[in-house]
Amino acid sequence: MSKFPSEKPVLVTCGLPYANGKAHVGHLRTYVPADIFTRSLKKTGQEVTFVCGSDTHGTPIVFNAEELKTTPTEIIKVYHKHFDEIFKKMGVMLDAFGTTDDPTNHNRTTEIVSKLIENGYVYPKTIEIAYCPSCDRSLPDRYVKGTCPHCKKEARGDECDQGCGKHLEPGELEHPACTTCNGPAEYKQQEHFFFKLSQFKDFLLEYLEGLGGTLNARNYALGWVKQELTDWCITRSLDWGIKFPGHEDLVVYVWVDAPIGYIAFTEEWAEANNESWEKFWKDDGSIIHFIGGDIIYHHCIFWPAMLKGAGYNQPDAVVASGMVKIEDRTFSKSRGYVVWVDEDYLDHGFHQDLLRYYLASYTSHTKELNFSWKVFQDKVNTELVGVFGNFLYRTLLFTHKNFGEIPEGEVKQDILDEINTTIENAKEAMENYEFKKYADTVMALASYGNTYFQSNEPWKLIKENKEACGEIVKNCAQITKALCLLFEPILPEKMEEAWKQIGMETDVHETNYMEATELVKSGTTLEKPSILFEKIEDEKTEEMEAISAARVKEAIAKENGTEEVEEVKEIEEMKDLITFDDFSKLDIRIGTIVSAEAIKKSKKLLKLQVDLGEEETRQIVAGLKESHEPEQLIGKQVAVLTNLAPAKLCGVESNGMVLAGVDAADNAILLQPEKETNPGTCIH
């Protein structure tokens, strides 16, 4: 049964862009799908509001302002305007876009933190804080760097961003150093305030079991909550930020006031539209967060616990995207692994809708996306130009030349059935946050239209029976109308143009999906159509690849010095042929990793608990330690050989095998399903 439209109003939010640098393609992996989802809900008749805002507090902005000899206020003014403009250029149409430094957010944050204090969920504690004797200052968050205590990779003060991804509390970082002078730091004692996150374990376990959205968010969070939950330091020694109640020398941690921004932006929207923000955050509205996969911990653990403690509604769904990479390196604007939205894309003349389609259709939303200009070119040329654009142009041009209008004729029931089936399948995909499946489903209707046009050969029929030919092109016009409505969430500007080309006078953005089967009107004048999608030439792709390669090379040189190119690993010799009977003896299934820990006696082995749809999880030992951090594996779905005889490795029993390949550097590469599925699903 379809979830939308529902009587409950829906609030869609996005993880806040940090107002400390420009927008890159990695940002858009969150914002474009959220916009697609919102547009789609509107097309079902659902009441939906879409809000976001700039994250304007925290140490990176202060750090940047000091380097540029300006103020945090000036920094955020520049980048808030930048993101607002980029979103509009990319068709991300927000109902409100505020900042966390708005008075509304200051007031709402103070109210919520005060309520947590009043309810007994906040307490003071003396802890060790990094301090630089050379600069004579405390070093919160990005002011300090060092070694992650968990994975031993270089990390920032509040997170291991290039290693295991763990949130780090003050004082945890090993071998601390000041990021301002690069000198060694030391730890000093200071009083800060903590949120009693540990008291919310039972609540979080129950809450997460019922959390909607994508499985990677729920499973990752559950894996953490099932372990020991530690209380959370929610203050920092900074001047910039929202003051902690009663303490002018402290501000609340940015991960407290940033998500509270969702409430503040809803308030700002409500005030501007004479609406109620409480219908989402206090009453029975539904809240859906779209975020990047790197901030699941904050949105699925800290945030719902804070909301519960302060008496607010918790999110109904969290939709977490896979990270975007370039040449297998995670996007990072500070490190230089990026493709900028303006100078690398829009300024080169690429249309906004092409990138929207690429991001939606390339791979499952929860999987990592390794950005490729070549794949981008192939998606545009093969699908948008070769399939969809080809059907639109040949249909409309033929109709214009031979009829000048939509001719008389009956729209066949099988055409209407195909459209209805496509609508239902597309809506189901969208409700499950499967944007690739949605795009593929709609593109299949374009392929159906091409086949229908080609098989009926109207260019021949026009010479023999113009009336019969007219009926064929009218059916094609009906398919075109449906495609415009179904592709509008992904290709809003192009579909606005196509909508006009088929003679429609209504607003395609405000037209319900179900109007796709309302018959096109015979006699509607059709002007000569324009070509909606142009091929991307190889020379342009090569130019863009060269720009990206140069930037990555520069980033590597800056970060690690000169790096030799790895030799290509020789392909292993193929094994002897086996019979199908031999293969059928293998029971290979999809499993979800629910916990992972190192085996101390081994340099290569990890002990995993894997959900295979059985009553209990399966313990499996896997040689993944050198290539994967245990925390990064939690929530991942993998291929498992389940009927391998039990064996003991380093004294630990293993009841199966996780299947993986090996790259040129002998790192394990996990085999994962195209989209998330039920644990225990058989691989045939």
Curated annotation (Swiss-Prot):
ATP binds at residue 333. Transmembrane segments: none annotated. A motif ('HIGH' region) lies at residues 17-27. One of its GO terms (molecular function) is tRNA binding. GO terms for cellular component: aminoacyl-tRNA synthetase multienzyme complex; cytosol. GO terms for biological process: methionyl-tRNA aminoacylation. It is an enzyme of class 6 (ligase). Homodimer. Is required not only for elongation of protein synthesis but also for the initiation of all mRNA translation through initiator tRNA(fMet) aminoacylation. PANTHER family: METHIONINE--TRNA LIGASE, METHIONINE--TRNA LIGASE, CYTOPLASMIC. This is Methionine--tRNA ligase. It comes from Methanococcoides burtonii (strain DSM 6242 / NBRC 107633 / OCM 468 / ACE-M). The gene is metG.
